[in-house]
Amino acid sequence: MAKLSSVNKNERRKKLVKKYAGRYAKLKAIAADSSLDDGERLIARLKMAEIPRNGNPTRIRNRCELTGRPRAYYRKFRLCRVQLRDLANKGLIPGVVKSSW
């Protein structure tokens, strides 16, 4: 199990990202638009810098739903490899079968 503080910190980050998502996307589009003059783009970048660091979507870490483990994460199942293997062997994940050839 991952430390509860790490899992909670990631949850706080998710809330901040959701809070600033609209503003962040709008400013990012302005900053990337090459048809605008450099002054407007610079202002957009400076406003992006004022958004809290944890409001940036890249700061979110994918974690296992059951254990909170941050590594070896399978997006399709939202589980780490350890839990995926355990649940698949027990037959608790529909459609997942052990391969043999």
UniProtKB/Swiss-Prot annotation:
It holds the Pfam family Ribosomal_S14. The keyword Ribonucleoprotein applies. One of its GO terms (molecular function) is structural constituent of ribosome. One of its GO terms (cellular component) is small ribosomal subunit. It comes from the Bacteria. GO terms for biological process: translation. Keywords: Ribonucleoprotein, Ribosomal protein, RNA-binding, rRNA-binding. PROSITE patterns: RIBOSOMAL_S14. Belongs to the universal ribosomal protein uS14 family. Binds 16S rRNA, required for the assembly of 30S particles and may also be responsible for determining the conformation of the 16S rRNA at the A site. Part of the 30S ribosomal subunit. Contacts proteins S3 and S10. PANTHER family: 30S RIBOSOMAL PROTEIN S14, SMALL RIBOSOMAL SUBUNIT PROTEIN US14M. This is Small ribosomal subunit protein uS14. It comes from Sphingopyxis alaskensis (strain DSM 13593 / LMG 18877 / RB2256) (Sphingomonas alaskensis). The gene is rpsN.
